[in-house]
UniProtKB/Swiss-Prot annotation:
GO terms for cellular component: cytosol. InterPro entries: Arginosuc_syn_N, Class_I_gatase-like, GATASE, GMP_synth_C, GMP_synth_GATase, GMP_synthase, GMPS_ATP_PPase_dom, Rossmann-like_a/b/a_fold. GO terms for molecular function: ATP binding; GMP synthase activity. The keyword ATP-binding applies. The gene is guaA. Residues 1-185 form the Glutamine amidotransferase type-1 domain. It comes from Thermotoga maritima (strain ATCC 43589 / DSM 3109 / JCM 10099 / NBRC 100826 / MSB8). Homodimer. This is GMP synthase [glutamine-hydrolyzing]. Transmembrane segments: none annotated. Keywords: ATP-binding, Glutamine amidotransferase, GMP biosynthesis, Ligase, Nucleotide-binding, Purine biosynthesis. Pathway: Purine metabolism; GMP biosynthesis; GMP from XMP (L-Gln route): step 1/1. One of its GO terms (biological process) is GMP biosynthetic process.
């Protein structure tokens, strides 16, 4: 097993995912967790938002002194090893984003060109290596980008786990097989069976209620839990009035065709919109929706004598809500995580909590879920409430539904929907001047957003052909009453998040 020590990096679970892609089992622990070293073949120390010289900065685990195997230390992990072994780290100019580095010959860089672009995210830098270490990569600004003692420590200042690092997957696989001499012995089926066993042990003969949206996350969670407890699972679809066009009807149709499950549809449109009246702050909107969601489920659970609530929370939700560890920096709360009310009368089960979106899709395919569900674009739990910037009203929701529908329909028409990871429209809280007919118009602005990603932790804006964007913009301004201008968002993640709120 490869143990990943999480120092609060947004990418810690991504390291685990890269390892699992190589069919090697991996788990994540925190620095103060107890560990059975007899099961550990290699250790990876993650990055983190702290400085090693801060008074309360996370330290090496207590068990690390006893561990004698290979270590890959990334970003903060590299600086921690350097400091602990007598080297020097100090505040630098910082390197962020895509950076060119020059590599030296080393087993971890086997099969990789001498110069590659990597993903940096650090303010501190190593200025002196510990005795016995030598640099094996230097950045274009002269900063030590990687080092090793040639025995058991390999240190990388950049993040090989993110897709923006060229040959990052190869570096991780080189560490696993060239350095650690591990063997491939873990499959996605092992993960599925392990999760089904865990769900059976957790829920037993009790009943569970599942928050079904019809998206890939909740659908995979539903099938997993159904495999474990059968008819003791009640799937509840809540129409909170924040859905896309025709979404409720589509979900009902699909699940009646493909799944032999108890499906209950709750019409809660009025109560959600009433709660959101006058609210403009995005965090408040998310919290309100999360709390109201749980109230709906608690009411429904009482009708079915249910003790457990199942949610399709995935790991990118957890990370952005800073629920993965005390050193992680919070980005925003998700209604499946930070939006939950503190006093919940149901026991929470989140079978996908440690998986990224692409892993969830692989699990879904393994379980035999139809491609039209598996390949559906991600949709936030709070729905269109976080795509209507500012106060949510029926009028704004209807405008956004139509604009979003046209954008997606246009992408499908040109066979482009499956070429982007996520695409949607956002209604901005501003109006702009325009001309319709021979008259002055003063109408809303719609932003179109499309990104390419693998796991949702990083994303690049999609280079959709101009003629497709032009067609979508023309249709929206022509067919959607109240919209006079369409813009296209060309911001990547980071610095932006994928959703606007």
């Amino acid at each position: 097993m490869v143990l990943v020590v999480d120092y609060g990096s947004q990418y810690s679970r991504l390291i685990t995912r890269r390892i699992r892609e190589n069919e090697v089992y991996s788990e994540v622990v925190f620095p103060d967790d107890k560990v059975d070293l007899s099961k550990v073949d290699a250790v990876i120390l993650s990055g983190g938002p702290r400085s090693v010289y801060e008074e309360d900065a996370p330290k090496l685990p207590e068990w690390f002194q006893e561990y004698k195997g290979p270590v890959l230390a990334i970003c903060y992990g590299m600086q921690l090893i350097v400091k602990e072994l007598g080297g020097e780290v100090r505040r630098g100019r910082g390197e962020y984003g895509r950076t060119l580095v020059e590599l030296s010959r080393d087993p971890i860089f086997e099969g990789i060109p001498e110069k590659v672009h990597v993903w940096m995210s650090h303010g501190d830098e190593v200025v002196r290596l510990p005795e016995g270490f030598h640099p094996i990569a230097v950045s274009e600004t002269g900063v030590i980008a990687a080092a090793t003692d040639g025995k058991r420590f390999w240190l990388l200042q950049f993040h090989p786990e993110v897709h923006h690092t060229e040959y990052g997957d190869r570096m991780i696989s080189n560490f696993l097989f060239n350095v650690c001499k591990l063997e491939k012995n873990w499959k996605i089926g092992d993960l599925v069976e392990e999760k089904i066993r865990h769900i059976k042990e957790t829920i037993g003969n009790k009943k569970a209620i599942l928050a079904l949206s019809g998206g890939v996350d909740s659908s995979v969670a539903a099938v997993l839990v159904h495999r474990a407890i059968g008819k003791n699972l009640v799937c509840v679809f809540v129409d909170h009035g924040l859905l896309r066009k025709n979404e409720r009807e589509e979900v009902e149709r699909v699940f009646k065709e493909h799944f032999d499950m108890n499906l209950v549809v709750v019409d809660a449109r009025k109560r959600f919109l009433e709660k959101l009246r006058g609210v403009t702050d995005p965090e408040k909107k998310r919290k309100i929706i999360g709390e109201e969601f749980i109230r709906v489920f608690e009411e429904e659970a009482k009708k079915h004598d249910v003790e457990f609530l199942v949610q399709g929370t995935i790991y990118s939700d957890v990370i952005e809500s800073a629920a993965s560890g005390k050193t992680t920096a919070k980005i925003k709360s998700h209604h499946n995580v930070g939006g939950l009310p503190e006093k919940m009368n149901l026991k929470l089960v989140e079978p996908l909590r440690d998986l990224f979106k692409d892993e969830v899709r692989k699990v879904g395919k393994y379980l035999g879920i139809p491609d039209r569900i598996i390949n559906r674009h991600p949709f936030p739990g709070p729905g269109l409430a976080v795509r209507v910037l500012g106060e949510v009203t029926e009028e704004k929701l209807e405008i956004l539904r139509e604009a979003d529908y046209i954008f997606i329909e246009t992408l499908r028409k040109h066979d482009y929907y499956d070429k982007v990871w996520q695409a949607f429209a956002v209604l901005l809280p501003i109006k702009s001047v325009g001309v319709k007919g021979d008259a002055r118009a003063y109408e809303y602005v719609v932003a179109l957003r499309a990104v390419n990603s693998v796991e949702g932790m990083t994303a690049d804006w999609s280079r959709i052909p101009h003629d497709i964007l032009d067609e979508a913009a023309r249709r929206i301004t022509r067919e959607v009453k109240g919209v006079g201008r369409v813009v296209y968002d060309i911001t990547s993640k980071p610095p932006a998040t994928i959703e606007w709120e």
